[in-house]
Swiss-Prot record:
Gene this protein is translated from: rpmD
InterPro entries named among the record's database cross-references: Ribo_uL30_ferredoxin-like_sf (IPR036919), Ribosomal_uL30_bac-type (IPR005996), Ribosomal_uL30_CS (IPR018038), Ribosomal_uL30_ferredoxin-like (IPR016082)
Record-given protein name: Large ribosomal subunit protein uL30
Annotated HAMAP family: Ribosomal_uL30_B
Organism encoding this protein: Bacillus licheniformis (strain ATCC 14580 / DSM 13 / JCM 2505 / CCUG 7422 / NBRC 12200 / NCIMB 9375 / NCTC 10341 / NRRL NRS-1264 / Gibson 46)
Keyword Ribosomal protein attached: yes
């Protein structure tokens, strides 16, 4: 399977709690932090929910 490189580009300050939880579940804590996840439906759903806060690159 492909891997996705997910980077938190915008802060979660002032964002709804569900978006904060989604960002934390992806493993992101700080702005400009990058994590790598397998490309699957669950991860894609989380990315879609916070797409305005993160950038995604396929590896």
């Amino acid at each position: 399977m492909a891997k996705l490189e997910i980077t938190l580009k915008r802060s979660v300050i002032g964002r709804p709690e569900d978006q904060r939880i989604t960002v934390r579940t992806l493993g992101l804590k700080k702005t400009n932090q990058t994590v790598v996840h397998e490309d699957n439906a669950a991860i894609r759903g989380m990315i879609n929910k916070v797409s305005h806060l993160v950038s995604v690159k396929e590896l």
